[in-house]
Amino acid sequence: MKLAICTDVFADLSYTDMLDKVKSLGIDAVEMTAGGWGARKHCNTAELLADEGKRKEFMGELEKRGMRISALNTSCNPLWPSKTGEEYKRSMYDCATLAGLLGVKKIVAMAGLPAGNETDTTPNWITSTVSWPDFMAPAYEY
């Protein structure tokens, strides 16, 4: 079995320090947030899409350590019934484009949830109402 780690847990570390930390734990693969609502601390999607040299440098740091990207993460809700959903769709597209340029074969994503009716402005996600996300409690009460 091969293990990977989602690098968001090392958001306080620089990209190279994070890679060194992960390698010191005996892990050779990383999942990096490249879109959605994640911090994207270690994977600047816009920069990497725009600059082939940056992509080579980015991948070179992994290769120096004998590491690889197991997946790019773009968890979000592209079906969100507002401008937010459009932004998430773009984010997912950019993540998929970057994955192709980097040779990454897996993307972690969420399908998302649509509105509950034609005039909804929040996703219809009332199965999680206690603590997260905080905007769902009013929908549940409604």
Q: Across the structure, where does each feature detected by a protein language model lie?
A:
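Active-site acidic/histidine proton-transfer and metal-coordination neighborhood
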Residues: T16-D17, K21, R55-R68, P78-Y142
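Glycine-enriched alpha-helix->loop->beta-strand junction motifs that scaffold or abut catalytic
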Residues: L25-A29, G103
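Extreme N-terminal starter segment of soluble prokaryotic enzymes
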Residues: M1-A4
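Glycine-rich, positively charged N-terminal anion/phosphate-binding segment
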Residues: T33, K41-E63
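Conserved beta-strand positions in the central sheet of alpha/beta enzyme cores
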Residues: E31, A71-N73, V108
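Conserved N-terminal beta1-alpha1 strand-loop-helix module at the mouth
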Residues: D17, K21-L25, A34-E47
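Residues that form or flank phosphate/diphosphate-binding pockets in enzymes
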Residues: L13
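Active-site beta-loop-alpha junctions enriched in small/polar residues
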Residues: C6-F10, T33-W37, T74-N77, G112-P114
